[in-house]
Swiss-Prot record:
Organism for this UniProt entry: Saccharophagus degradans (strain 2-40 / ATCC 43961 / DSM 17024)
Family (UniProt): Belongs to the UPF0301 (AlgH) family.
Record-annotated membrane-spanning stretches: none
HAMAP family recorded: UPF0301 (MF_00758)
SUPFAM superfamilies the UniProt entry points to: VC0467-like
Protein name: UPF0301 protein Sde_3637
GO cellular component: cytosol
InterPro entries noted in UniProt: AlgH-like
Domain of life, source organism: Bacteria
Length: 203
């Protein structure tokens, strides 16, 4: 699992829309019901980084047919983890062989992006070793791959009503079951996502 360096953070994603740029860092993207993309349908994406050069996020509600125990085995780690049975998430279509850990505790890992007071993103192997040994962050999720947007692409998709946006709530990432996260985020907008059409958006 490679480190997350400054080049990675801005590789394959960057936006500049007309008018004043507004960053959606530490926001959720809630897929509109009409979004038919097989990767992002009914998805909830946490935006980790968003500048005028692009955006990067992790999908937090798409479980794979893979567990943390499988990852530990692939990395030849001794598995003492109480969380070994937890599902690995499909974080997005970019760098799908690479692991990313979203977690609450900041810790002292080799490659951590501090996104919000209670949300961090680490892409170095040391955190996986710690999780395998039950010494990792108390609240975390493990994803393979990430979602990336080039300059202006995310803004265009929001204008096209592909996404709803809302400031992120870390409890949805870490405390709510995977299958409930999409609807839970939408409820914070005061809507029932299951009753929405694809003809209205919120930016």
């Amino acid at each position: 699992m490679a480190t997350l360096d400054s080049n990675d953070k801005h590789d394959n994603h960057a936006p500049e829309a007309a008018g004043e740029f507004v960053s959606l860092r530490d926001h959720f993207l809630i897929a509109m019901p009409g979004l038919q993309d097989p990767i992002f349908s009914r998805s909830l994406t946490y935006i980790c980084d968003h500048t005028a050069q692009g955006a990067m996020g992790i999908v937090v509600n798409q479980p794979m047919n893979l567990t943390l125990g499988d990852i530990f085995e692939q990395l030849e780690l001794q598995d003492k983890a109480q969380q070994a049975g937890r599902a690995v998430l499909a974080g997005g279509p970019v760098n799908t062989e690479r692991g990313f850990v979203l977690h609450r505790d900041s810790g002292a890992w080799e490659s951590t992006m501090h996104i919000a007071p209670d949300v961090n993103l680490t892409a170095s192997r040391d955190i996986v070793h710690a999780i395998a040994n039950n010494t990792g962050p108390k609240s975390s999720l493990f994803a393979l791959g990430y979602a990336g947007w080039s300059a202006g692409q995310l803004e265009e998709e929001i204008s096209a009503n592909s996404w709803l946006t809302i400031p992120a709530d870390s409890s949805i990432i870490f405390d709510i079951p995977v299958e409930d996260r999409w609807a839970a985020a939408a409820r914070q907008l005061g809507i029932d996502i299951h009753l929405m059409s694809a003809t209205a958006g919120h930016a």
